[in-house]
UniProtKB/Swiss-Prot annotation:
Domain of life: Eukaryota
Assigned keywords, A-Z: Cytoplasm, Developmental protein, DNA-binding, Endoplasmic reticulum, mRNA transport, Nucleus, Repeat, RNA-binding, Transcription, Transcription regulation, Translation regulation, Transport
Keyword Transcription: yes
Organism lineage: Eukaryota, Metazoa, Chordata, Craniata, Vertebrata
Protein name (Swiss-Prot/TrEMBL): Insulin-like growth factor 2 mRNA-binding protein 3-B
Comment, domains: The third and fourth KH domains are involved in RNA binding and self-association. Stable self-association requires RNA.
């Protein structure tokens, strides 16, 4: 996304005019300006500079009497599901933006882009081309808290080329402000980004590094020359987040490439930092710092630290990991610090990232398998998988994620609270609670649920009961994190599925509805969800006239079974209310068949 389209140009504009404009604005460019009638194209060194050009020039600079517009250049066949929305009010709540985007279709992914501007920028992926077209049409120029939104297409590498007949059938768009529409720029010329691009493999996990701020200039080089050379040498895309955490001693770098490309770029960056340190007489050690989502760190460390110790021994390095207490809901990454020579650190990076990629692929495989079973829940928003803001590819890259506006309850309605008893290995209680209760408190805040661990039933009890109280989405978040934590901390083997038993209480009069005639309903539940569902016979109802339903299975199976049982209970309650109303009105009740 480093290629720019410059529109609304006067007929008199020449390449030297545009070169002068970019130089005055201190925006580097590569190659020549390709000027057409009323518009032009140019390449920037990287995506960061392209965004800088858009923020600095678009709608703000006049050239030969016309205010120019600058945006990402998108080949026609890649104008599909992906949009970039700029000029978003800086303090806007995510829920407000999500609900606005959902008005025009199903949103599969929404990620914030780091820019120099005060306003926010997001990249949005809709479920299909028509939803994206509606979003572009309705949101471009939309007034939100006195800010006018600016919406453009960005390349969708997963888009399938249209047949000539489809292209003829599709009407060309007219931009609301009257300039050349997106459908009127003609075909992408040779060399357009993505002209021969293939979809990225889903398993591509970027490498995230932290580097001392004083070395960022050396890594970029004069007018971006050094970073440009690194990207060419290693066939990678490198984002240096210079504006993140203003004044911080370290800045994050995200490297997108194959595992080999990421490792090669990492090694070159370490060499540049070492040379710059020598030139500036910087005497402190410069360790390699890798950022990794907390979801993967437990598996990287391994039981009793075995995995990490092996990497240290094999690579002759010293590796430490930042404490859990440093995590927040907004920063779910931990810092893996590797000390050693450049050669040994490079080897350690390969081994660390290999483990992280394996963990990521296992999680995505589980999500691919079961995501379609739970409609109406926003899987991307639940935090069970790494958010794309931390540099991880969003799960929606390979999943038809059921993210819809149904993820939010109707305005004015509060979803009913539920209580679930989840049974975990007794040995895992310490991991769930965390040091001084930090983990369970953070989990409770994250999920929006009450989470308590019941006392052990006896000194030899192998299981402990976790009592989770909250609405459906809070249950999903809390239980999902508990399943994930047990896997991370190796309470289950690397190829073993985490299966837990959950108990939910139902009114005794509704137990028959859960079982169904001759066990039909409970059998259908088991076939649909892959969970084992048991309503023990001859139970004595408790003081609240409730009996227990036992559900055993992996996370998604258990969740689907819980939701289906809650649907049955809601149906029973509605029928009861209807019967009460009918009885009060004195009308005869219809007989149940």
């Amino acid at each position: 996304m480093n290629k720019l389209y410059i529109g609304n140009l006067s007929e008199n504009v020449s390449p030297p005019d545009l070169e002068s404009l970019f130089k005055e604005s201190k925006i580097p460019f590569t190659g020549q300006f390709l000027v057409k009638s009323g518009y032009a194209f140019v390449d920037c060194p990287d995506e960061t500079w392209a965004m800088k050009a858009i923020d600095t020039l678009s709608g703000k600079v006049e050239l030969h009497g016309k205010v120019i517009e600058v945006e990402h250049s998108v080949p026609k066949r890649q104008r599909s599901r992906k949009l970039q929305i700029r000029n978003i009010p800086p303090h806007l709540q995510w829920e407000v933006l999500d609900s606005l985007l959902a008005q025009y279709g199903t949103v599969e992914n929404c990620e914030q882009v780091n820019t120099d501007s005060e306003t926010a920028v997001v990249n949005v992926t809709y479920a299909n081309k028509e939803h994206a077209r509606q979003g572009l049409e309705k949101l471009n120029g939309y007034q939100l808290e006195n800010y006018s939104l600016k919406v453009t297409y960005i390349p969708d590498e997963m888009a399938t080329p249209q047949s000539p007949s489809q292209q003829l059938q599709q009407p060309q768009q007219q931009h609301p402000q009257g300039r050349r529409g997106f459908g009127q720029r003609g075909p992408a010329r040779q060399g357009s980004p993505g002209a021969a691009a293939r979809p990225k493999p889903q398993s591509e996990v970027p490498l995230r590094m932290l580097v001392p701020t004083q070395f960022v200039g050396a890594i970029i080089g004069k007018e971006g020359a050094t970073i440009r050379n690194i990207t060419k040498q290693t066939q990678s895309k490198i984002d240096i987040h210079r504006k993140e955490n203003a004044g911080a001693a370290e800045k994050p770098i995200t490297i997108h490439s194959t595992p080999e490309g990421c490792s090669a770029a990492c090694k070159i960056i370490m060499e540049i930092m070492q040379k710059e340190a020598q030139d500036t007489k910087f005497t402190e050690e410069i360790p390699l710092k890798i950022l990794a989502h907390n979801n993967f760190v437990g598996r990287l460390i391994g039981k009793e630290g075995r995995n990490l110790k092996k990497i240290e021994q094999d690579t002759d390095t010293k590796i430490t990991i930042s404490p859990l207490q440093d995590l927040t809901l907004y920063n779910p990454e931990r810092t893996i610090t590797v000390k050693g020579s450049i050669e040994t650190c490079a080897k350690a990076e390969e081994e660390v990232m290999k483990k992280i990629r394996e963990s990521y692929e296992n999680d995505i495989a589980a999500m691919n398998l079961q995501a379609h079973l739970i409609p109406g829940l926003n899987l991307n928003a639940l935090g069970l998988f790494p958010p794309s803001s931390s540099g991880m590819p969003p799960p929606s890259a390979g999943v038809s994620s059921p993210t819809t506006s149904a993820s939010y309850p109707p305005f004015g309605q509060q979803p009913e609270s539920e209580t679930v008893h989840l049974f975990i290995p007794a040995l895992a209680v310490g991991a769930i609670i965390g040091k001084q209760g930090q983990h369970i408190k953070q989990l409770s805040r994250f999920a929006g649920a009450s989470i308590k661990i019941a006392p052990a039933e006896g000194p030899d009890a192998k299981l402990r009961m976790v009592i989770i109280t909250g609405p459906p989405e809070a249950q999903f978040k809390a239980q999902g994190r508990i399943y994930g934590k047990l896997k991370e901390e190796n309470f289950f083997g690397p190829k073993e599925e985490v299966k837990l038993e959950a108990h939910i209480k139902v009114p005794s009069y509704a137990a028959g509805r859960v079982i169904g005639k001759g066990g039909k309903t409970v059998n259908e539940l088991q076939n649909l969800t892959s969970a084992e569902v048991v309503v023990p016979r001859d139970q004595t109802p408790d003081e609240n006239d409730q009996v227990v339903v036992k559900i055993t299975g992996h996370f998604y199976a258990s969740q689907l079974a819980q939701r289906k049982i809650q649907e049955i209970l809601a149906q029973v309650r509605r029928q009861q209310q209807q019967q009460q109303k009918t009885a009060q009105s004195g009308q005869p009740q219809p007989r149940r068949k």
